[in-house]
Design a protein with these regions (language model features):
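Pepsin/retropepsin-fold aspartyl endopeptidases
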Residues: 2-314
C-alpha cells in the first residue's frame, strides 16, 4: 500500500511546470479499445468507479504500486463485509497491522476479481472508498487518460494495436510492480517503479547520495508525506532536470528523498531508485501500463503545452 499524499502543501516545493513534447510524438489518432471507465482526478491521482459485491459504484483509487486491493473501513462497515484475519500492511512510511474484510467480487467495468481478503484502511487516509492494486491489474492493460480523466481496462492477453506514435519503454516485473531500468537522473542510472497511487515522485537515499553527497542544496526543502496507513514520512524535496525514462528526457521534476520501507521491499536500498508518482505521470496525455507484457507507453500532449517539460533523445 504505497500511496503517498503531500501533508504540508503550503510549505513544500513548487510543482513542475505544465509538460511539453515534440510534435513528432504527438498521438492524435490513438484508438482505445476495451472497457473505458469514467474516472476523476483529485489533485493528480486517478479514481475509478468500482462495484463491491454488486454494490456501487464506489470511488476507488488506482494504485499500481500497491500489491493488493483495499477497501475503506467506512465502506466495509456500510456493506457489512465479514471481518477476517489481521494482516501487516506496508506503507511508504512504515508498517501497520489492520483487519481484513471478505470481498466476494470487485468489478471494474467488465473485469472482475474475487473472492479476496482486502485490508480495511481509514477512509480519511485513503481519500477514497478503496484502492485497486496489482492483484486486480496483473493480467490487465491499464490506459490512464489524463485529458479525458478516464481509465480504460483491457485484457492484456489481447494484442495491443500500436499507432507508431507512442513512446514504448520495456519494464521488469518485481513483486508484481513494473520497474523501468532504462532510466536515469542527471545521467545517474536508476531503477524506476511506476506508482500511480503516489502524489509525488520519491527517490531513495542512495540516489540522493549519488546526486548531492552529504550536502544539502539551498533550494532543497523539508516536507512531510502522509501514507495510506496514516503514518507520516519526513522527506527532502527538490526540482531536478535531466530525468530520463527510455528516450524521454524530463525537466523540472520534483523529487522527494526519503528512506521509505518499500525500497527495501524491492531490494532497492543500495541502488539509486525512484518511485514515479502521478505528479510526473499526469504531465503526459496518456500513460498505458501493461502488467502482463511488462510494457509502459507514454503519449505526449501538444508541444505548446509541454514546451518546458519533455524532450526526446534519439
Amino acid at each position: 500500500m504505497f500511496m503517498l499524499a503531500l501533508l504540508l502543501a503550503n510549505a513544500t516545493v513548487t510543482p513542475p511546470s505544465p509538460p511539453l513534447v515534440a510534435p513528432a510524438v504527438i498521438d492524435n489518432s490513438l484508438e482505445i479499445t476495451g472497457d473505458s471507465v469514467a474516472a476523476e482526478q483529485l489533485k493528480k491521482r486517478m479514481f475509478i468507479d468500482v462495484k463491491v459485491n454488486d454494490s456501487g459504484p464506489h470511488r476507488f483509487l488506482v494504485d499500481s504500486g500497491a500489491d493488493r486491493s483495499v477497501v475503506s473501513d467506512g465502506l466495509a462497515s456500510q456493506l457489512k463485509l465479514p471481518v477476517g484475519e489481521t494482516v501487516r500492511v506496508q506503507g511508504m512510511a512504515g508498517q501497520r497491522e489492520v483487519a481484513t474484510v471478505e470481498v466476494a467480487a470487485l468489478t471494474i467495468g467488465t473485469s472482475e476479481i474475487g473472492p479476496i481478503m482486502a485490508p480495511a484502511l481509514s477512509a480519511r487516509h485513503l481519500g477514497a472508498d478503496g484502492l485497486i492494486g496489482i492483484d486486480a491489474l496483473a493480467d490487465q492493460r491499464l490506459m490512464l487518460d489524463f485529458d479525458k480523466r478516464s481509465i480504460t481496462v483491457q485484457d492484456s492477453r489481447q494484442p495491443y494495436v500500436a499507432t507508431g506514435n507512442e513512446i514504448l519503454v520495456t519494464a521488469r516485473r518485481r513483486k508484481g510492480q513494473l520497474i523501468i531500468t532504462q532510466a536515469s537522473v542527471d545521467r545517474r542510472e536508476v531503477a524506476a517503479v511506476i506508482d500511480t497511487g503516489s502524489e509525488i515522485t520519491l527517490g531513495n537515499s542512495a540516489l540522493r547520495r549519488r546526486l548531492f553527497g552529504a550536502s544539502k542544496p539551498k533550494d532543497m526543502r523539508d516536507i512531510e508525506l502522509l501514507s495510506v496507513t496514516g503514518q507520516v514520512l519526513k522527506a527532502e524535496a527538490i526540482a531536478l532536470n535531466n530525468v530520463q525514462i527510455g528516450s524521454l528526457v524530463l525537466s523540472n521534476v520534483v523529487i522527494a528523498f526519503a528512506d521509505a520501507p518499500p525500497f527495501a521491499l524491492f531490494g532497492l536500498t543500495e541502488r539509486p531508485a525512484i518511485f514515479l508518482g502521478s505528479d510526473l505521470l499526469s504531465n503526459f496525455r496518456r500513460v498505458s501500463l501493461d502488467f502482463r507484457n511488462r510494457k509502459v507507453r507514454f503519449t505526449m500532449r501538444p508541444e505548446t503545452e509541454q514546451r518546458d517539460f519533455v524532450t526526446r533523445r534519439f
